[in-house]
């Protein structure tokens, strides 16, 4: 995917995730949409910073970088949705492009992708981006309903019960 595809994904995610978090469709939904926009776009564009240095789709396109970004909310509360932008960037590059990404870099240089991807110049790139974004939103909705409140990070009751039963 290219920058346009990643920004399209982030904009659609901000709209969809706002309705997942605040489904009322009132002012609160639109405020949430505005609050989500910057961290999602930031996260969606961050992995491509490695085009200016390092090895593109390796240096900032891997699981160790995602783990660091997942830890952002612990230290920087206003960046709690950046990880979603980064994770969906990875998904777009794995599912939506022919090349894939080096998920296990720097341990392995192997790039992982699926054969359904298209070239960034393909006329189908935007369509595939929208389809992948809809799947991402469906997955985020399931996480929100069944696993964790994405706005607060609080586990749902069933998950909390399972976690409470684990030996410490």
Model-derived segments and spans:
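N-terminal membrane-targeting hydrophobic helices
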Residues: 1-168
């Amino acid at each position: 995917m290219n920058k346009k595809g990643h920004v399209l994904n982030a904009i659609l995610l901000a709209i969809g995730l706002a309705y997942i978090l605040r489904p009322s469709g009132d002012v609160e939904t639109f405020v949430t949409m505005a609050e989500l926009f910057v961290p999602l776009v930031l996260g969606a564009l961050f992995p491509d910073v490695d085009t200016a240095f390092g090895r593109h789709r390796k240096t900032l396109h891997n699981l160790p970088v995602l783990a660091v970004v997942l830890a952002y909310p612990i230290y920087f509360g206003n960046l709690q949705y950046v990880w979603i932008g980064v994770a969906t960037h990875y998904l777009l590059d794995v599912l939506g492009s022919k090349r894939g990404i080096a998920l296990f870099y720097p341990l392995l240089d192997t790039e992982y992708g699926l054969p359904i991807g298209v070239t960034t110049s393909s006329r189908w790139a935007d369509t595939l981006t929208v389809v992948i974004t809809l799947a991402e939103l469906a997955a985020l909705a399931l996480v929100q309903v069944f696993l964790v409140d994405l706005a607060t990070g609080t586990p749902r009751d069933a998950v909390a019960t399972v976690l409470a039963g684990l030996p410490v």
